[in-house]
Design a protein with these regions (language model features):
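Mid-to-C-terminal functional-domain signal that highlights helix-capping/loop sites
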Residues: 1-237
Length: 237
């Protein structure tokens, strides 16, 4: 099930199977600026950005996340030339095509107080969770650096910007040290000199053919990420 919350810029894919039953969902409302979805089978209400049922018979249950990436269409088409594209419903196509809606959303008032954090509520972040520990990475900082090596829960992580200059993936750095590369090799490890692509796979050098493990990550406005991950760390690099 593909979900997207316009108010918090959060796109997530969830497995709709719960207790062996496929649930069917529809939009139910908004809670603290994040979308709510309701399943037709039990009328339980679920938080879009966490996949948790917060009301109804299934309260406390969590949907399992399905790994996904938010990519530009050009980059996705390059990676998946035979991939299918979901067409918008004809009656609503004019709504999909509206320009400038993000600027409008960024001006909306939020009910989550972020003043103590010193970060604006609509600062776009990339949220990463490792071993139950959370960390938020300002998107602008990642796009500027192109390759960022850091730690979450003591584990080495690698954030990489795609050739389109907009898409981001996160990998388990596997205790290698990476720098920016060139061409298809967007990054190079200092340990062996191998070049690595945006899929996290070595395309040349001693480690050619080896692939890093991808880590789930998703974009979220700061107010929403902080609200659902109050103990989060924030990248300061």
């Amino acid at each position: 099930m593909v979900t997207y919350c316009t108010l918090c810029h959060t796109g997530l894919v969830w497995d709709p199977m719960v207790n062996g039953t496929r649930l069917h969902f529809r939009l139910a409302g908004i809670n603290n600026g994040n979308a709510l979805i309701r399943d037709e089978e039990t009328s339980s209400v679920w938080q879009q950005s966490t996949g948790e049922a917060i009301f109804g018979p299934l309260k406390g249950r969590h949907l399992n996340v399905v790994r996904s990436n938010e990519l530009t269409f050009a980059l996705w088409r390059k990676e998946q030339p035979q991939g299918d594209v979901l067409k918008p419903d004809a009656p609503y196509i004019s709504e999909y095509e509206k320009k400038g809606w993000e600027t409008y959303v960024e001006k909306t008032v939020v009910v989550v107080d972020t003043t103590k954090s010193g970060i604006g509520p609509h600062q776009l972040m990339l949220g990463v969770t490792v071993a139950g520990k959370n960390k938020a990475y300002p998107i602008d900082a990642i796009l500027a650096a192109r390759v960022v090596q850091d730690q979450v829960a003591g584990a080495p992580v690698l954030l990489v910007v795609g050739s389109d200059g907009a898409s981001i993936r996160v990998f388990d750095a596997a205790e290698l040290t990476f720098t920016k590369g060139e061409g298809d090799a967007l990054m190079q490890d200092a340990d062996t000199g191998s070049g690595w692509n945006f899929q996290g796979c070595a395309v040349d050098g001693k480690l050619a053919g080896r692939c890093l493990r991808e880590i789930d990550a998703y974009k979220d406005y700061w107010f929403d990420w902080m609200n659902h991950h109050p103990e989060t760390a924030v990248f300061k690099g």
